[in-house]
A protein has these predicted regions:
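Short amphipathic alpha-helical segments and helix-helix/interface helices
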Residues: 29, 33, 57-62, 128-129, ...
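Soluble or luminal CAZymes and related metallo-dependent hydrolases
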Residues: 20-28, 53, 123, 185-192
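Conserved SAM-binding loop
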Residues: 42-148, 223-226
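Class I SAM-dependent methyltransferase Rossmann-like catalytic core
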Residues: 1-37
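Short alpha-helix
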Residues: 181-201
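Short glycine/proline- and acidic residue-enriched helix-loop micro-motifs
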Residues: 14-15, 173-183
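Conserved class I S-adenosyl-L-methionine
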Residues: 139-168
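Core SAM-dependent methyltransferase catalytic element
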Residues: 205-228
Length: 228
């Protein structure tokens, strides 16, 4: 199984950028704690767990080590994480758009920086729908904001504001053959997330716009099933 990486390394400043990423994600984790019912007794599944062991990734696993009811689902082989995160109850390999879990299996379904990597807009709809189906209470999903001036995957500014077909053609021309494929990168803006909510007939949700410095770098969608 081929493990994927969605982070373009930048010479000389890569470690600095990873520190910024970690800081940003820890701020988002604070929003998670503030806006959900999470406690150390909740059952939670992280969908889209990465095999990358750098501390800027898998923040949710780092911050929940007192909880013995945490599971992970990834399309990559994440067995290597068992040693680093011994508190994790279950590691699953599968497709977040279509899982084998029963309805309402987990108190909270969590997914960080995965939605933009599941492919087409229809795939993104299916992904959110599946997260909602297997959650009993809440869904917490983060994704980079296409409206931000820079794409943090490629580290290129403004280019992703072009129509997506043109954006992908340019990425291919300048050597970003991985990111030029919709199946690997399909950024969303707030309007797109609202459209997905309407398609899925989800009414009890809120979208937070997380800022890095003065820029709205990340979108966070929180769905509360107790009222839907």
């Amino acid at each position: 199984m081929r493990n994927l990486t969605y982070w373009v390394k930048v010479p000389f400043i890569n470690n600095y950028l990873l520190k910024i990423l970690k800081y940003n994600r820890e701020k988002i984790h604070n929003l998670f704690l503030k806006n959900t019912i999470y406690n150390d007794n909740c059952s939670l599944i992280d969908i889209g767990t990465t095999v990358d062991t750098n501390n800027s990734h898998n923040i949710i696993l780092q911050k929940t080590q007192k909880n013995k009811n945490i599971s992970c689902l990834s399309n990559q082989d994440i067995d290597s994480l068992k040693k680093k995160f011994p508190h994790i109850k279950d590691f699953y390999i599968g497709d977040g758009k279509k899982t084998d879990f029963d309805d309402n299996t987990y108190d909270i379904v969590y997914s960080s920086a995965t939605l933009e990597h599941v492919g087409s807009f229809q795939n993104q709809i299916n992904f959110i729908n599946e997260c909602t189906r297997i959650s009993k209470y809440q869904i917490f999903i983060t994704t980079p904001n296409r409206s931000c001036f820079i794409d943090f995957h490629t580290k290129l500014p403004f280019l992703h504001w072009l129509p997506k077909k043109i954006h992908r053609k340019i990425l291919k021309l300048i050597g970003y053959k991985f990111y030029c494929l919709e199946e690997n990168l399909n950024l969303l803006d707030k309007k797109s997330l609202i459209k997905i909510m309407k398609i899925l007939n989800i009414t009890n949700f809120k979208i937070l716009e997380h800022k890095f410095l003065i820029f709205k770098s990340n979108l966070i969608i929180i769905i509360d099933k107790k009222i839907n």
